[in-house]
Amino acid sequence: VDYSFFSPPFKDLYTYSDDPRDLSNVTSSDEFYKHFRYLVPELFRVLKNGRLLSMHIMQGTTSIGKDGFLSIIDFRGELIRLFQESGFIFHAEKMIRKNPQLAAVRTKNVQLMHGQTKKDSSINRPGLADYVITFRKPGDNEVKIKNDIDFDLWCKLAEPVWMDINESDVISNFRKAKANKDEKHMTPTQLSVIRNCYLLWSNVGDVCFSPFGGVGSEGCQALKMDRKSINIELKNSYFNMNVHNHKAFDLEKNSVLTLF
């Protein structure tokens, strides 16, 4: 494949299904990494020499109920080391701003609450950003990546922190893929994040691959930008919505308006 973009399960932070094959359905971090280690060499194998792979991730946290203390877990760093072990070169990292007030309302995390500053602000911490970490496979890139990126756009893309990503800029029908019995959390990646990465690190006509295809965010954005899409998805409800969205995007792109 020419480029891979995906958002992996965030260890045991979110559980997406009760399927024992689901990487998010684990009892510990050690169990997650034991299974994830099988995937990384295969990602290295299918990626073309000199090309890139990007992951959309966030840091993990501990909890009082489960761990007995509050702290940040360096999930980002653990993944970087894991991919380097398999031969990948750590190429780039992008931080994405997230609204700490929205996170406080959604998670009810005491560390983000303003009221906690009135009691004991040693407990408080800033909100957590998202990250896109990008790796390069060693070797010469035979087909150079050349897109029409003007100077102003490049200055925006080159910023170390993307401040303007709208957290609601996600594929519109993702909630329809929700399964009643086993759904725990749904976290589609913002389309603008995927678009920026495709623009930087893939050409028109390239094959873009996601091993965690979800409801099709990466794949549909690939089609929209005249790339080709390969997605893998374990969960049936996600897979069915993924197929539906791919077909809908393909139909929309190839439709012709006829005037009579």
Language model feature labels by segment:
Residues 243-260:
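S-adenosyl-L-methionine
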Residues 1-241, 259:
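Core catalytic lobe of class I
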